[in-house]
Design a protein with these regions (language model features):
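Solvent-exposed, extracytoplasmic
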Residues: 142-175
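Short amphipathic alpha-helical segments
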Residues: 5, 23-38, 145, 149-153
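Short, basic/aromatic recognition patches
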Residues: 94-117, 146-155
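Juxtamembrane extracytoplasmic/periplasmic/luminal helical "stalk" adjacent to the first N-terminal
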Residues: 1-24, 105, 121-122
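Soluble sensory domains of the PAS superfamily and closely related sensory modules
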Residues: 40-42, 92-107, 191-207
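Conserved beta-strands of PAS-like sensory domains
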Residues: 118-152, 214, 221-224
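Extracellular/periplasmic ligand-sensing ectodomains of membrane signal-transduction proteins
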Residues: 42-103, 173-180
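Extracellular/periplasmic juxtamembrane segments that couple receptor/chemosensory ectodomains to their
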Residues: 179-224
């Protein structure tokens, strides 16, 4: 949120001068982004800001997004913003950008396989950046799901029965049993007709996750 606040303040200052910020202004946020990525206990796989087209004086579409590369090196995320290209990346259509823009609220999207070429499931957390009530972009972070799952497991593992946390579309975020793998579709596990099955909305508006408690005893991880 500190990076989002800085981007908003910078946009506000430039607007007061009758100008727009440039890509150079956003590049100055790299030190803070580095610190977030390289924290000793960080689950963050990539993070930065993505701007609404037309917000910069020198670029139509722009993102200042960095990710963890090989050997712990922080590297920039590079995407193709040439609208005439077959590989054009239209982030305006992505849910992590469109939903904060349309709702004005924080969102959590995923899990889905990342864009980084590592075939890793990630969750994208994003929040809208507004300047004087006007949407100018989002600040976000990609969280490696296998790391985030460990945090959730500390609570799930205390439950005797099979329990899992699922996303809005029904994908497994975390489970206390070897019967489920993160990223699995679990619609049938949410069958409210199953005797003893409980589905509890977790109440987090940004994520729309549910806790599913099934009537069967959990199968311990590593069990045959």
């Amino acid at each position: 949120t500190s990076v989002a606040n800085e981007v908003g303040e910078n946009r506000r200052r430039e607007a007061a001068l009758g100008k727009k910020p440039s890509s150079k202004d956003l590049a100055e946020k790299k030190k803070k982004i580095d610190a977030q990525l390289q924290g000793s206990k960080s689950c963050i796989h990539g993070t930065g800001v993505v701007l609404e087209p037309g917000e910069l004086e020198d670029c139509e579409m722009y993102l200042e997004w960095w990710r963890m590369g090989a050997a712990g090196k922080v590297v920039p995320m590079t995407l193709n913003f040439n609208r005439r290209s077959e590989s054009f990346y239209n982030y305006q259509s992505m849910q992590w950008f469109a939903r904060p823009k349309n709702t004005g609220s924080n969102v959590v999207i995923g899990p889905y396989v990342d864009l980084y070429g590592a075939d890793t499931y990630i969750l994208t957390f994003s929040l809208p950046i507004h300047v004087d009530g006007r949407f100018v972009g989002i600040a976000g972070a990609d969280i490696a799901l296998h790391k985030f799952e460990r945090i959730l497991l500390s609570s799930l593992i205390k439950m005797e029965n099979e329990a899992l946390i699922v996303s809005e579309e029904g994908r497994v975020i975390a489970a206390n049993t070897a019967n489920w793998t993160v990223g699995d579709m679990a619609h049938h596990a949410m069958n409210r007709q199953e005797t003893g099955c409980r589905v509890i909305e977790l109440g987090e508006a940004a994520a729309h996750w549910s806790l599913v408690q099934r009537p069967c005893k959990r199968k311990h991880r590593g069990a045959a």
